[in-house]
């Protein structure tokens, strides 16, 4: 049974999220602040951790910083709408994804499943020492569009040879958008690509992900302008010049 650590000072969130995850067969360990969680997470690493950012005694960012000194387990942050700067810092520290409050329990569960699948694939690849010849399916998972390169098997993305750190959802959105270079994708299609099941997300959710994608690419290339807005429709990954 896979274990998930949940750290939040809101006991209602601890209870509701624990119930949702336990229904899916996960074991859940809960903590009410970062200070009480740090020793337990290092001594008994779970398969995945979910942190709130703003907590008493030790916030989620400091907890992640200390955890990363000992462990590389996947981490999802629960954030407020005004914590965009914290998100960028969290990604640099090694967070895997962010979910904005208030959130759907079903959405959170699907994010957890997606990240654990990715982690399992990464561990399997590491176990082989990277020496196995890629299968046809694995080769098909490698996408190249101009200066963009994405490896779905390893969940890596580069632009002009420079790595770009993406969350699971951002990766899936871009991996759906890039093959349609020059044509564009409707928001509904991007939602379907990013979420495994019929999880409700509104247009603004996709818009927020696109905004973060643009910012991340601009960190490695200040002139990046390849993700274009198609007003009233969706987005387009521009064709390489």
Curated annotation (Swiss-Prot):
GO CC annotation: cytosol; protein-DNA complex
Top-rank taxon, per record: Bacteria
Domain Response regulatory, residue spans: 3-116
Subcellular location: Cytoplasm
UniProtKB keywords: Cytoplasm, DNA-binding, Magnesium, Metal-binding, Phosphoprotein, Transcription, Transcription regulation, Two-component regulatory system
Post-translational modifications: Phosphorylated by ChvG.
Modified residues (4-aspartylphosphate): 52
Positions contributing to Mg(2+) binding: 8-9, 52
PROSITE patterns: OMPR_PHOB, RESPONSE_REGULATORY
Signal sequence extent: none
Transmembrane intervals: none
A family per Pfam: Trans_reg_C
GO biological-process terms attached to the record: regulation of DNA-templated transcription
Regions recorded as binding DNA: 140-239
Protein's recorded name: Transcriptional regulatory protein ChvI
Gene name, Swiss-Prot/TrEMBL: chvI
